[in-house]
A protein has these predicted regions:
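Bacterial Sec-dependent N-terminal signal peptides
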Residues: 1-43
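Accessory carbohydrate-binding/adhesion or oligomerization-edge regions at the termini
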Residues: 41-144, 226-234
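Accessory beta-strand-rich segments of carbohydrate-active enzymes
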Residues: 43-57, 80-81, 95-99, 105, ...
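Residue-level detector of high-confidence beta-strand sites
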Residues: 99, 124, 203, 311-313
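Beta-strand-rich binding/interaction modules
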Residues: 196, 280-315, 321-323
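Exposed aromatic-hydrophobic patches
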Residues: 211-217, 320-329
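Surface beta-strand/loop "capping" patches
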Residues: 262-292
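Metallo-beta-lactamase
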Residues: 332-338
Length: 338
């Protein structure tokens, strides 16, 4: 390994720059790509998705490396997405309804004209049990429902299956019109159902893994919009969580919207290596891009002081680009100088 604080990628197109910043630890995102993902349609399943092992994601984006697409190299180097005009947080108070049993959840709550005036305010991120909704359970071995019903995978009871329904109105910046707009949810346990402006968007049940949805066709920039979510305490995936931890329900990590140009870098995979008897270094970079065939992608590697130490350029073909960046005698990683 060798040292290098950040790599800047610039997708050159006539309309806008798409500068993507990522640290080398983004390679850990490959763990997400190894997950088995089901894409069965709801109409093809007799059981609801939350009891169907063949379905754990519906209409979600493919898991990717963790990075944010800034509008300038200067913002990318600061790495504070909150300062980007392409970022909009959804954190804070949402209108919230909690029921102990899933079958008591409000029907049609995602409709734009649904009356939620009697709902309470609840923080996002926030966990049900921490805020007084349901019992806090710590379990070392065995399932949290062991005293309530017998295990029969993949089936889960609706009784004591806490369910939280969320609603939030907000306005999208008018200058996001024409861009792609995505929603990022850092963690939803045990599952997440999503609607926008009364229309179903998607489903996910990978509790601790982040998930993203494409909201472009559902949102109206410059106008008031409604997002509705529903989270359940247990689903069929909960059978895989017989571990030593607190059994909490809700959204535990950041939630936000972000915008990108139509032509964009959608994923990056970087493999660092040492060559020439461990003296020199190289980065093998694989880029996935959308609506960018024939366009150039420029790479710029900077050290921890902000000095450019290497550059490269390649052209997208078939939505892909592979590029090698070579470095002469870079700083090496050690336990003393990580």
């Amino acid at each position: 390994m060798f040292l290098g604080d950040f790599l800047l990628l610039n997708l050159n197109n006539a309309n806008s720059l798409n500068d993507n910043w990522m640290k080398r630890n983004m390679l850990m995102a490959a763990l997400f790509l190894a997950a088995t993902v089901g894409f069965a349609a709801k109409t093809e399943s007799k059981a609801p998705w939350w009891m169907d092992p063949s379905v754990n994601r519906v209409n979600t984006l493919t898991p990717r490396a963790s990075f944010f697409a800034y509008e300038s190299a200067e913002l990318a180097q600061k790495n504070q997405k909150e300062s980007s005009s392409r970022f909009m947080t959804l954190e804070g108070d949402w209108n919230f309804n909690w029921v102990k049993d899933h079958d008591k959840a409000p029907a049609g709550f995602y409709a734009v004209d649904y009356d939620d005036s009697k709902w309470v305010k609840f923080p996002v991120p926030g966990l049900f049990e921490i805020h007084g909704y349901g019992d806090r359970i710590y379990k070392n071995v065995g399932y949290a429902w062991a005293t309530q019903f017998s295990s029969n995978p993949p089936y889960i009871e609706e009784k004591n299956n806490y369910t939280g329904s969320y609603r939030k109105e907000f306005e999208i910046p008018a200058d996001w019109k024409g861009d792609n707009i995505y929603m990022h949810v850092g963690s939803a346990t045990s599952n997440l159902m999503l609607w926008v402006n009364g229309k179903f968007v998607g489903y996910s049940e990978d509790s601790k893994a982040e998930v993203e949805f494409d909201l472009t066709k559902f949102l109206q920039p410059g106008k008031k919009n409604l997002i509705a979510m529903q989270v359940m305490r247990w689903c069929d995936g909960s059978y895989l969580e017989d571990q030593d931890f607190w059994r909490f329900t809700g959204i535990a990590r950041e939630v936000y919207l972000y915008a990108t140009p139509k032509a964009r870098v959608s994923d990056v995979y970087i493999t660092p290596d040492l060559v020439n008897n461990y003296r020199d270094g190289k980065l093998d970079v694989k880029v996935s891009a959308e609506n960018a065939n024939g366009q150039k992608v420029s790479f710029e590697l900077k050290d921890q002081t902000g000095k450019t130490v290497a550059t490269a350029e390649g052209k997208v073909a078939g939505g892909k680009l592979a590029q090698t960046i070579e470095l002469s005698n870079p700083q090496k990683w050690t336990a003393e100088t990580p």
